[in-house]
Amino acid sequence: MRAKVRAALDALYMKRLVRELEGRPRPQHIGIMLDGNRRWAKMSGIDDPREGYRAGGAKVLDFLRWCDSAQIEHVTLFMLSDDNLARPEEQLNPLIDIIAEVVEQLAAPGNPWPVEAVGALDLLPAESASRLKTATAATQGRKGGTKVDVAVGYGGRREIVDAVRSALTEHSSQGGDIDEFIETFTMEHISKHLYSKTRSESDLIIRTSGEQRLSGFLLWQSAYAEVHFCETYWPDFREIDFLRALRSYSLRERRYGR
């Protein structure tokens, strides 16, 4: 009985949130840090942290459907940082396998999302990197769904360094010298060589689990992003929590440094 009452109240509250968002500004690019999977498992009395990651992976599909409903154009999912790659293999490899499974689910026929894996994929186990590339390649050309970047082996500082290297390599391959490169180098060169082909700046970054730091996520793209911290662990993240984040964004005055 109590569960039914709670569900009814949640449904009413969601309708209210949807009404409040009507005609309000919405982010076009959301970056979300899927944090708290291991702590969720521990809180739930589950000894195996992999079950927390699996629960978090299942939540991804729900989240993307909410983004479709809210007409969000672009989402970046922060699933594995480059710092995480230093974890022991017995912890890391199962997590990477779960991420690959999630990406393969997103790529399954019938789903609308074009998916790209962004990050230092060359640092991943070769088989896992191949699975990610194969799955994401199958989604290219899709239209109608939210564009999804899956950040795996991702670090914001590494992305900027790699972008500069890529820009320098391109310049050199065209016969340019280093002095010319230094003289003509601009911020646009970095933006052009970031991991994601979409090249859109982030409007809103959401981090679950109550942690209040960005940990290098979308370091270049988040210069003017609004940030929303949510206490809920990622596997328990609800559409209500998502709509609250959108409402928080809609009520802010974005100044873009002015």
Swiss-Prot record:
Tell me which EC number(s) this protein carries.
2.5.1.-
Q: Residues that bind substrate, according to the entry?
A: G36, N37, R38, R39, W40, R50, S81, D82, D83, R87, R207, R213, L214, S215
- What are the record keywords, sorted? Magnesium, Metal-binding, Transferase
Its required cofactor(s), as named, are: Mg(2+)
Answer whether the UniProt record assigns the keyword Magnesium to this protein. Answer: yes
GO MF terms here are: magnesium ion binding; prenyltransferase activity; Z-farnesyl diphosphate synthase activity
Q: Which Pfam families match?
A: Prenyltransf (PF01255)
Record: active site: D35, N84
- What's an example GO BP annotation here? polyprenol biosynthetic process
Is Magnesium there in the keyword field? yes
What's the top EC group for this one?
transferase
Q: Which HAMAP family does this entry report, sorted A to Z? A: ISPT
Q: What is this protein called?
A: Isoprenyl transferase 2
